[in-house]
């Protein structure tokens, strides 16, 4: 029989119960027993939603209090030694690995965090050593599976496969071949399968998303040997791939001794024919035909026709599913009561997406007439979207068509610009700055909420925001920072804020998705041509600059990041949408410069995460991404200093594209990787200024002055002294004021020590063996 199933459901809860509960636990306001009870309630709710929608096989084990990769590391005992001695409680150990701090107050450096493939979700990077051992450590998966079965759900446990787990991890200390760990790791996976089998489970979903990447031959071979060795203890295994095409890994994937294969049709429709021709006759094919990464409703008529053709070849060996876990979309469109009615009809969130999968499955089982009403209603929606006049703006399209190469070049090269900027800004050696946002207190969040709900008027809102900006400027001046920011109190999110002010973009009320841990974001929905009617940031920056003689940065989010962190229209190339955003930002940049702003930051933290997963497609992306940044940033004079910021980036393979952005200063997130990212600059002479993040803002832990100095001096191995900036590694929005002021005070102290050590002597007086790079 054709089944409807799902790869994973959002964890956060319809009202973000997960966030509220886990943060209460971190604050010591609830017990661990209360924490676990909330986990049970959230999972039961998720399973009920899916079952009532008509999903046959319910994913179990997709819930996590922080991150599923972290859960897998803890489950198999891959707990770094620095955490083992700190916490006997496995839950607190997990939180300490993620945050550097457990609820019991014990601190150490957190594990590294990076992006999950090309999504905006972050995972905690497993750490492996040459003497790594593994053992079954955590029973959360088994408890959840038992709970689902006891509640009469047909449970399909979901785990990250052994090869993807190793690939996504990192060698700590001495480098070695991670594949050597398989011998110790596979017996633990076998234990997991044995316990699941003993519970009466029929199917297990093993996620191996790295099969859509360019894999070295030894990793391809490892798939064959690994899955031949794995003992599933009579469980049926659905091997799940997503985010791209199997491509050159298709043949080996079809050889693996598993019972079913899931493919992502939405991201890689061209692979379908090859998969059908190579799939062994006994295996299930799960077709991910519902887009798990975007919010547009499915064209059910078109999808059903495609699935009917597949069914004619496979019969009951066909399953229907979303393309990937629904972790990446909001939970329930029914919670949106402020969206424009026509726009809302075009959307589908997680609850609606599992219903779409169930509708299609019923159509395959019982014939089209069984879902005739749904098909008719859906067809009306699809036609409405295609013919709506609100999508296209002739003025925007004309402006985009008139863009020339000249608009994407600064007046002179960076060396000339730097001399002019140095004369104008009068900055010291090792200039200090922050990335943009400052702590957002509950009072600020309540202020914005009350303003949006009409509880306070424009005048009171303006007064309160100005008070906050004045306080932030005053704190920075007192701390001794060199280039200031206004703190962004008016912004709820660095992308959503601009989405609210740009035409062609819709904002939801409850469209939350998980970014990392308890942090949730509400991605804007780009439904049509994008344009700017009026300045978006000018009044706040002008006010902030009026309070100080020091430079205050204009703060913008770049075109690629707005694109990456939004749900994007799928009726034109993403590059065209990015160009429209860039043109809107260019107007804002020029308005800021005309008002006297001397430093403008255009954040592109998503620049690398948007890289296609296959290298063959990189060049095309990098070309249009660089052009869009330059289109946004190059309309200013030489004297205006352009900054950009990037997160979680490995620069080695795209360093030339980073340089091609031609930002005067780039700040990068590097503290958790212990400045390993800076090795990118070892062989490539990056010509512009760099500010490597020298303390981790994602952890509540406050670094010592000596730690900051050490990281800065390490950076000098790769960056000439006159080009090195001192800054945190990301915005400070999620930290509290006490942490922020103390950490920044230590950062400024470290910069002062560095100036003293390097300004008057050829060799630093700081007691470190590292020597600075030459110019």
Curated annotation (Swiss-Prot):
Annotated pathway: Amino-acid biosynthesis; L-methionine biosynthesis via de novo pathway; L-methionine from L-homocysteine (MetE route): step 1/1
Binding site for L-methionine: 435-437, 488, 603
UniProt keyword terms in alphabetical order: Amino-acid biosynthesis, Metal-binding, Methionine biosynthesis, Methyltransferase, Repeat, Transferase, Zinc
Residues annotated to bind Zn(2+): 645, 647, 669, 730
Cofactor note: Binds 1 zinc ion per subunit.
GO MF annotation list: 5-methyltetrahydropteroyltriglutamate-homocysteine S-methyltransferase activity; zinc ion binding
Lineage: Bacteria, Pseudomonadati, Pseudomonadota, Gammaproteobacteria, Legionellales
CDD domains in the record: CIMS_C_terminal_like, CIMS_N_terminal_like
Name by which UniProt lists this protein: 5-methyltetrahydropteroyltriglutamate--homocysteine methyltransferase
Catalytic activity: 5-methyltetrahydropteroyltri-L-glutamate + L-homocysteine = tetrahydropteroyltri-L-glutamate + L-methionine
Binding site residues for L-homocysteine: 435-437, 488, 603
